[in-house]
A protein has these predicted regions:
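Extreme N-terminal signal-anchor transmembrane helix of membrane signaling/transducer proteins, especially
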Residues: 3-34, 193-211
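Juxtamembrane membrane-water interface segments immediately C-terminal to a transmembrane helix
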Residues: 16, 30-77, 192
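Amphipathic coiled-coil signal-relay and dimerization helices
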Residues: 28, 102-108, 156
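Cytoplasmic juxtamembrane amphipathic helix immediately C-terminal to a transmembrane segment
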Residues: 36, 41, 208-220
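Extracytoplasmic/periplasmic sensor domains and loops in membrane signaling proteins
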Residues: 73-80, 110-151
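Short N-terminal helix-loop-first-beta-strand/juxtamembrane motif that initiates sensory/input modules
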Residues: 84-103, 140-143
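Short, hydrophobic beta-strand elements of compact beta-sandwich sensory domains
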Residues: 158-183
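Membrane-interface helix-start motif
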Residues: 179-197
Length: 220
């Protein structure tokens, strides 16, 4: 308290501003951390939902097979044609592998189709499709994190995918979102928050200056 008394009125007002801005900064950091977590969770949930929706296409063609309308081979081929053409958020796609795991259909890397993909690993040594197959066998569905190149690029980037087993055909359908896209969106929000915070700081500093002058001048 004695320390505060030794401060001038102007210094006290600036101290209030500094404390207020520090608290605002701490609150902003907490909010940004929550935004980051929510953004990641939102992307993961969206991926889960679109995979579940795409799995409905497999169910539809399997229904045609069980009804005798199509042979299994014809039903599977038509289902693959439809799923291979599906896109969302511009370039995001679906692939299908089986439980061995062999690639059944990959729309952006056709050279994988029909091949054993159990040995494919990301730069960290993670056996991508083997882990997906194991997850599908044990839990039926789930999320897998790994690194994989974007379409048209050879550089692996962080990706989180959702995979789901379609048991009648022994297929695993999956789709994923690239984390760098999410990070770019997050940092866009960070910069927006920084500019807003800077604007608030400038306004508050101007107000403190005006208030300090209005108090000090009559006392001089």
């Amino acid at each position: 308290m004695n320390t505060l008394r030794r401060l001038s009125i102007s210094q006290r007002l600036w101290l209030i501003l500094v404390v207020s801005m520090t608290m605002l900064l701490a609150l902003g950091l907490l909010m940004l951390n929550q935004i980051h977590d929510d953004l990641y969770e939102g992307k993961a949930q969206k991926t889960q939902h679109v995979v579940q929706a795409a799995s409905g296409i497999l169910k539809y063609y399997h229904g045609l097979e069980t009804a005798g309308t199509l042979s299994r081979e014809a039903a599977q081929q038509q289902a693959l044609t439809v799923v291979s053409q599906l896109r969302y958020d511009n370039d995001d796609y679906f692939w299908i592998n089986d439980l061995r795991p062999y690639m059944v259909m990959h729309p952006t890397n056709a050279k994988l189709d029909g091949n054993d993909v159990s040995a494919i690993k990301d730069p960290d040594g993670f056996a991508i499709f083997s882990e997906m197959a194991n997850l599908a066998k044990t839990k039926g569905s789930g999320t897998v994190d790994y690194r994989w190149p974007k379409p048209g690029s050879d550089a692996p980037v962080q990706k989180t995918s959702y995979v789901q087993l379609f048991e009648p055909w022994g297929w695993v359908i999956g789709s994923g979102v690239y984390i760098d896209d999410m990070q770019a969106e997050f940092w866009g929000q960070v910069w927006q928050a920084c500019w807003v915070g800077l604007g608030i700081a400038i306004i508050m500093a101007a107000l403190v200056t005006l208030i300090a002058r209005s108090i000090v001048r009559p006392l001089q």
